[in-house]
């Protein structure tokens, strides 16, 4: 079966000229339809004003339209204007006028694109200039004299323009707020009305308006109800009235973009809530010790409200590192117990890097660790000659990327050493929880021992056995009330982004004599829509008129596709054959 | 039976390179010497076998290391090449065009060559995962991000091809019909508004312009898919970061550049959907976006510091 469903090129020629804004090559203007008494004739006021608002969806030729397709502005080249409404008796109040004007400015597309571009540029600056460093760092790396970075960028400019903490600078936050305002304005002025429009279906009765649709064709010898039936079988929602038909499918594809913007606003609300209402802090809890959560939390702003878990106490029962054979870390494990104010145990959990502990609105993440003390057994120390157990506190050594902790065991009584000199002793260094390295008083390397092996080492006249490192677990504590909002926004964004790619297809039809004129439009996947419509119209059964002398007429018309399969069936007057012929308008 | 996995992997990567090289040569010869230019079965076989080599290589690495093969730069580059090949095969089969192969096969060849021959050997080893990466989110976040890079890079590449070819073709059009230049402009616009055709032969000017329209539309659709994946990737990364460190956004260079990429393509899509732009103007935005994606994917890792860095170039 040959079907020729051709895009209306006639409309194209009209609309190639003119500003890009009013170029609606392939849509019928709504104004055309007001000629018919039973069609919706009244354009709501919002549509008229929207003709002049930039942030609305025009249908570009290769682009997906429109949240409010086919309903808004009259084409500038059609030569037909809707009758101007009479001026209102009294203007709206100045406040309302100001509100409307502000909304219009904010929902300007060019403004929104400019905002996105500036935010992107400033974010990029923040990745080039290292953030959050000390004043000296910028003085050193962006010098005042000599070769200045980029010829003009000195440390003073960096700090003065807040480029060292650009993401929390006021102008950056204001820009983000402006973007949020633009999103809100766009949703109010354009997208929300589109939802209301979507609920109102509009018929097109005039042949010319149907012909002007993106995809249009005439099905001879068919009935409107059959067209409707075929559409319904393809999951279209079909409405029929007085010889006219309207069907649509995939309304979600039209509402998707609105959902995207609404989800983004929800995310922004969550960000603000978290930024203002959250608590954060980090704490090192040595094995066996405990700490009150509230002492570690710092509020983000005066508006923050205390989470319930702030009064709890966390105790670290154990901290261990799981090492692989090659010495790299497989995982960190902390056994934590949460106690309430009175010391009763609330919960216990083994926390690791991707498994945090949640209690009372506070979450504890395993992010760090340190060594707090080294347990050794020493024979021959200045304290006592026999085996004595020491627990030596360790300190972190700076420099290099990896952790290094050290402690010192004096070989002689420090009080007896001459003032101003350091006593002789043994330095013990550890990088991880597996081995300890020993150095003597002169700083010479003395040996390495595995923790827990029990092997002694002789340094500076003492016999030392390194038994165990007491580690401390580093926990990041966070209470963020905005997270539910942010997650809800994220979830909405995931769903609505995907949904926005669905095609919103609309089909109009009207009975014209013995045949039906069908036209349609789709906001995405136009080629597939054309194919689909073509296939659907192929399934519309042929209905012949009763007069027998029309058999010849049909026989003649049959030659267009030559498929009179069952020439006898064409003489019946009921909806017989499934063949259908179409003519190109 | 002890299987020497590194040897097999080496064999697979070399054969993948060889197959892609032969496929590139084949496409160029086929286009250069004319012939019917709908999709090419031989070319697709070449692509398909390269895809199989890469799939096997990834599976072997998975078996060898015990974790999902997407933990370092080398594996992510292989996965990117894999996604590009898959995407290209789908496009060629569904749109039945040959010409794209001429453009994309050398690009994928360069990518695979860089991955296998330029990357230092120590970066190619599969290393065990650090604790922060031991999570199921690794599979979701990284695959979606790499897939989005593949779609965006392909779409932007097509847009660049559009720009280059449109300069070339429009010159030709003007040369052949200088007196009717006004008509030519209108004709070009009206052709851009017609639906795509599938013949791509360069002798006739009409066909050239239809092909330009096809490129324009294809780049738009590919970038659209890429943008969708990019959104999902960024969101899954944020949720993962919140589960691991309690902070869904820390303005890490990689996060920031992913956000910048997202903003760039949001501009592109809005200029098309809402502003109604077609043709050269969005293609320029897409060309800029091409650079942005590369900076986001490789530039940040190689140059910067932060949670995502490999940092083997010290700047």
Curated annotation (Swiss-Prot), chain B:
The organism's place on the tree of life at top rank: Eukaryota
Segments passing through the bilayer: 15-35, 39-59, 73-93, 97-117, 144-164, 222-242, 257-277, 283-303
InterPro entries given in the database record: Cyt_c_assembly, Cyt_c_biogenesis_CcsA, Cyt_c_biogenesis_CcsA/CcmC
GO molecular function ontology, one term from the record: heme binding
Keyword Methyltransferase part of the UniProt annotation: no
Sorted UniProt keywords: Chloroplast, Cytochrome c-type biogenesis, Membrane, Plastid, Thylakoid, Transmembrane, Transmembrane helix
Membrane topology: Multi-pass membrane protein
Record's signal peptide: none
CC per GO annotation: chloroplast thylakoid membrane; plasma membrane
One matching Pfam family: Cytochrom_C_asm
Locations listed in the record: Plastid, Chloroplast thylakoid membrane
GO biological process: cytochrome complex assembly
Role summary: Required during biogenesis of c-type cytochromes (cytochrome c6 and cytochrome f) at the step of heme attachment.
Quaternary structure annotation from Swiss-Prot or TrEMBL: May interact with Ccs1.
Membership in a protein family: Belongs to the CcmF/CycK/Ccl1/NrfE/CcsA family.
Protein name: Cytochrome c biogenesis protein CcsA
Native source species: Chlorella vulgaris (Green alga)
